[in-house]
């Protein structure tokens, strides 16, 4: 099987799984019950990774849905793609590079990525909800991702506090000057900006999910996985 064919099958499987979870109203377990967090580090990692993967699946699903409805031609996609604002964060490009980053530094980078999306996700929900022709699927997923991102942030903070308490407070947040409000702009510009924002969300949520899995292997399993 070619890599391209494998990628297509993986994307389709991701879409099916995301739809199944969302339609059945299946959500990841809370990070901590009633604020009481008597968990081992492995339990915290397992629960946070379940949540990060859910957020990534929802983001990928929303991107596929938006692309299907608004980005059918190559010219649109070429005009839409710009750098993501979080590109200012010096995140590793691949697994080998991530392995060279100290775990406490990588955890703070993950925390920075997730925290940097809090405000833009709230803005995204408002913008998508204001598009009359937007599908219920896109609107619902935007709202769900916004809620789950807050829980993901809480979980990563708990991991950092338990594993490396001395490293807390070292995160750096990106500035979102590239994603101004979409009010008052023409329809094409709005669609281009939304496409890029959702694309960046998918990219960053995938990074977070992969980094967390890598860190679980390094910290919990001592690289024996």
Swiss-Prot record:
What's a GO cellular component annotated to this UniProt protein? Answer: extracellular space
Fetch the InterPro entries from UniProt.
4_helix_cytokine-like_core, Somatotropin/Prolactin, Somatotropin_CS
Q: Name one GO molecular function term.
A: hormone activity
Name of a matching Pfam family: Hormone_1
Protein biosynthesis among keywords: no
| Family annotation (Gene3D superfamilies) | 1.20.1250.10
Q: Where in the cell? A: Secreted
Record's keyword terms, sorted = Disulfide bond, Hormone, Lactation, Phosphoprotein, Secreted, Signal
Protein family membership: Belongs to the somatotropin/prolactin family.
Q: How does it assemble?
A: Interacts with PRLR.
PANTHER family given in the database record: PROLACTIN, SOMATOTROPIN,PROLACTIN
Q: What is known about what this protein does?
A: Prolactin acts primarily on the mammary gland by promoting lactation.
Report what the protein is called: Prolactin
What is the originating organism of this protein? Answer: Alexandromys montebelli (Japanese grass vole)
The gene behind this protein is PRL
């Amino acid at each position: 099987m070619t890599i391209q064919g494998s990628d297509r099958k993986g994307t389709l499987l991701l879409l099916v799984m995301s739809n199944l979870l969302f339609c059945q109203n299946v959500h990841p377990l809370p990070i901590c019950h009633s604020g009481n967090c008597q968990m081992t580090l492995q339990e915290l990692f397992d629960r946070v990774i379940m949540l990060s993967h859910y957020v990534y699946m929802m983001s990928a699903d929303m991107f596929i849905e938006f692309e299907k409805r608004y980005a059918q031609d190559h010219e649109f996609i070429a005009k839409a793609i710009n750098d993501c604002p979080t590109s200012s964060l010096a995140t590793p490009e691949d697994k080998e590079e991530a392995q060279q980053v100290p775990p406490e530094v990588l955890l703070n980078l993950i925390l920075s990525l997730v925290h940097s999306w809090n405000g833009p996700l709230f803005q995204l929900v408002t913008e998508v909800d204001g598009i009359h022709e937007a599908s219920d699927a896109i609107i619902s997923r935007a709202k769900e991702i916004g809620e789950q991102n807050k829980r993901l942030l809480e979980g990563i903070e708990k991991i950092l506090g338990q594993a490396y308490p001395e490293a807390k407070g070292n995160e750096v947040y990106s500035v979102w000057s590239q994603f101004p409000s979409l009010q008052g702009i023409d329809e094409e510009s709005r669609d281009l900006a939304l496409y890029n924002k959702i694309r960046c969300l998918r990219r960053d949520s995938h990074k977070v999910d992969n980094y967390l899995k890598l860190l679980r292997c390094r910290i919990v399993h001592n690289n024996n996985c």
